[in-house]
């Protein structure tokens, strides 16, 4: 009797199965109403995102390049023939590449194209606010006593507006001391001289010598004076 009763109970009460699955339409929202954060496996398609207008960006970049290049010598990336002639478009080199090939070292804050690292775009030389004492001649300190005028000219020749180097060597006031080198570099105008000054300030000529001095440049107070040249050529 007891066995028959329990068999009837088992037939009437089946063990509960798993949760019933709802149709997909019950829990899936239309693709147009789903947000990015809805569902862990959903990723928006490319057409769902806003695509910037590349034509607008390109035209703005073109205007930026034109504004940078509109000034005289607006960048330190300049083309100049190796023989010291006028600027040429076929032999363009940056001052960074030129100096690295010579073995020199630029300051740590020196950025590409001769500009210091910063968030502002490079300002064209013609639009730069020059100091009141700016002149077209730079006075350079920190050159080794045995350097020649040709070596100094190699450093400044890539800059637009470069004219010539005047090197004067004086005897030291101390016995057995190294000669004193006075260096003057002439440019066509103060703006070109300011570009070279900002690019080469703190430049070290020889990275292999631990005691190599850093160049210190400033505008010459007497740009018109031309002392006798006793420097090595």
Swiss-Prot record:
UniProt KW keywords: Nucleus, RNA-binding
Name of the coding gene: NSRA
Domain RRM intervals: 136-222
Described function: Alternative splicing (AS) regulator that binds to specific mRNAs and modulates auxin effects on the transcriptome. Displaced from its targets upon binding to AS competitor long non-coding RNA (ASCO-RNA).
Tissues in which the UniProt entry reports expression: Expressed in root meristems, lateral root primordia and root vascular tissues.
Organism field: Arabidopsis thaliana
Protein name: Nuclear speckle RNA-binding protein A
Disruption phenotype: No visible phenotype. Nsra and nsrb double mutants are less sensitive to auxin.
Induction line: Constitutively expressed.
InterPro entries named in the record: Nucleotide-bd_a/b_plait_sf, RBD_domain_sf, RRM_dom
């Amino acid at each position: 009797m007891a066995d028959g009763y329990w068999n009837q109970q088992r037939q009437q009460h089946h063990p509960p199965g798993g949760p019933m699955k709802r149709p997909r339409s019950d829990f899936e929202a239309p693709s147009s109403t789903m947000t990015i954060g809805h569902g862990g496996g959903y990723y928006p398609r490319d057409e769902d995102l806003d695509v910037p207008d590349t034509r607008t960006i390109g035209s703005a970049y073109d205007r930026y390049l034109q504004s940078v290049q509109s000034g005289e010598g607006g960048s330190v990336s300049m083309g100049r023939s190796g023989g010291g002639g006028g600027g040429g478009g076929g032999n363009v080199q940056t001052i960074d590449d030129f100096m690295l090939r010579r073995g020199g070292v630029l300051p740590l804050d020196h950025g590409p194209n001769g500009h210091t690292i910063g968030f502002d775009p490079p300002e064209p030389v013609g639009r730069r606010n020059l100091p009141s004492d700016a002149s077209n001649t730079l006075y350079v300190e920190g050159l080794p006593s045995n350097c020649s005028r040709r070596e100094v000219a190699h450093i400044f020749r890539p800059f637009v507006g470069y004219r010539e180097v005047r090197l004067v060597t004086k005897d030291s006031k101390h016995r057995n001391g190294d000669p004193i080198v006075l260096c003057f570099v002439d440019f066509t105008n103060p703006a070109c001289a300011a570009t070279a000054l900002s690019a080469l300030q703190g430049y070290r000529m020889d990275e292999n010598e631990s005691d190599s001095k850093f160049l210190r440049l400033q505008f010459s107070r007497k740009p018109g004076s031309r002392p006798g040249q006793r420097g090595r050529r």
